[in-house]
Amino acid sequence: MGKEAATRVRRRERKNIASGVAHVNSSFNNTTITITDAQGNTIAWSSAGTMGFKGSRKSTPYAAQVAAEDVSKKAQEHGMRTLEVEVAGPGSGRESALRALQAAGFTVTSIRDVTAIPHNGCRPRKRRRV
């Protein structure tokens, strides 16, 4: 009567891509790192949250470093060697993620800050008074 669900696991095919772009998005709460090819197709990604950090630990530089090590391991399985790095956001994991990518053996050809700056757009959140 009922169809059986397809339980076949989709294998990730090994692409052989030598160079790509690492997008490091570091917010106040989390750090996500996505490695794409030159056209923008995602090769590998990771974040501090997917590495098991919860709550305020996700926003630490160490969590960003662990996420960068994980995504670099995944990207090197596809044969990636050189990276351009685009860093966005105001968070604390920017520099540590960049250092972890360099320490993983990638040749970093360029580093760009692509943080969006509003031309008087949305009203910002209120200042914290501690």
From Swiss-Prot:
Keyword field: Ribonucleoprotein, Ribosomal protein, RNA-binding, rRNA-binding
Cross-referenced InterPro entries: Ribosomal_uS11 (IPR001971), Ribosomal_uS11_bac-type (IPR019981), Ribosomal_uS11_sf (IPR036967)
Top-level taxon of origin: Bacteria
Record's GO cellular component terms: ribonucleoprotein complex; ribosome
Gene Ontology biological process terms, A to Z: translation
Coiled coil: none
Disulfide bonds: none
GO molecular function: rRNA binding; structural constituent of ribosome
Known role: Located on the platform of the 30S subunit, it bridges several disparate RNA helices of the 16S rRNA. Forms part of the Shine-Dalgarno cleft in the 70S ribosome.
Family: Belongs to the universal ribosomal protein uS11 family.
PANTHER family: 40S RIBOSOMAL PROTEIN S14/30S RIBOSOMAL PROTEIN S11
Quaternary structure, from the entry: Part of the 30S ribosomal subunit. Interacts with proteins S7 and S18. Binds to IF-3.
Protein name per UniProt: Small ribosomal subunit protein uS11
Organism: Nitrobacter hamburgensis (strain DSM 10229 / NCIMB 13809 / X14)
Gene: rpsK
